[in-house]
Amino acid sequence: MKNEFRDLICENSEESNVFLCGIPLDKNASVGKGAKEAPRVLRELSYDLPPLDRKGNLLTKVKMYDAGDFVSEDFDILKSNMDEFLKYKGFHIVFGGDHSIGIATNRAFFDKCLRLNKIPVIIHIDAHPDICDTYHGSKYSHACPIARAIEYGYKDENITLCGIRGFEAQEIETFKKHRLLDVFKANDIKEMGIDMLISILRTKYSDDKYLVYISYDIDANDPSFAP
């Protein structure tokens, strides 16, 4: 294999502090397919990125272990895969896949938090809330992971939705029932600035009692940058 992640990869998981896996699934995407290729493509693109931060500092402390891809369309199987993946001690990164993979990943994260006696938090960065009960007849659509997270036990006050600019009618009704959900629409962030948003989130979740799961969908970006 080519020099994936430019020398950040560590072959020994016990010596690593960052853990990567992929879930190449796009069965539940409603508008176009191709997201299942992302884990492979992101790894390929990493060949050309030097291991430096934005200030030019070498990321010498990063030791990344790639656990490979978990390939299944069964969320129970994927959840079991994630239970094992989250046993690695360190920082975890999961490449999707359409956003339905969150149904499995946030369940595994929730269960890990319970074992550690921590409060599970979701910061969902997306153009859409993904809080539909069903979408196109499915409860497992890419439009449903936050709805399934609430069903699973996440508290409304520990879910923050960032970058929202598109809603389904049913989601508006859901927000009326779940008023403690924290929502920062795209226009809100534009007005306050990203630094203010980061400050708010750091303040809210700074206590060690929280563990934070960050979910990022590329359509949270302005379409001029990610058409």
What residues fall within each predicted segment?
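Conserved alpha-helical scaffold segments that buttress catalytic/binding sites
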Residues: K2-P227
